[in-house]
Amino acid sequence: MYKRQVVDLPWPENKNFAKKCKKRSIYFIQLLSPTTTSKRLKKIIQDSHPMNYFISMLSTTGGKLKVSPREILKNYNRIKKINPKKEIVIGFGMTDKTIRKLKSADGIVVGSAICKEITRSLNSRQNPVTNVGKLVKKLKNRIAS
């Protein structure tokens, strides 16, 4: 199954696009944030495909974690209770130090960490594929421990 996320197309403006995705067996990933009201969350999740992306904090991607993992999990659990069958992945500001505390989530997005590793590898003339593989393995081990 292919997945698509369009960050500047919020609910309900994205309904037509989401329907077109569904017809083509493409998941359209809805964005949820800590400031999304409960009423709006219920409507978004009701209309959503099987997976949603929870923006853990109000910041820029790859920013330093400014919210405690406990607060992130509190918001995650509030969202998850609306429909436990929908997958909720957490992203924004995830670091290898915090993901262990968030391992109860359906998934954790670490895109900025991967981008930083690619840049670091290229700047030091190392193999980015190898180094990203090592990073992913390290993060996976943190979650498993």
Task: Label the model's feature ranges.
Residues M1-Y2:
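Short, small-residue-biased leader/transition segments that mark boundaries at the very start
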Residues V6-K23, T37-K42, T61-R78, D96-R100, ...:
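Active-site-adjacent beta->alpha loops and helix N-cap segments on the catalytic face
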Residues V7, P50-M57, V109-S112:
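Non-cysteine beta-strand/loop elements that form the S-adenosyl-L-methionine
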Residues L9, L31-T35, M57, G91-K97, ...:
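Active-site beta-loop-alpha junctions enriched in small/polar residues
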Residues C21-L31, I79-G93, S145:
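Short beta-strand/loop segments at the ligand-binding rim of alpha/beta enzyme cores
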Residues S25-G63:
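Histidine/lysine/aspartate-rich catalytic loop segments that bind and position anionic ligands
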Residues T36-D47, I82-N83, I90-I108:
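Catalytic cores of alpha/beta
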Residues I114-S145:
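C-terminal helical cap(s) of enzyme catalytic domains, especially alpha/beta-barrels
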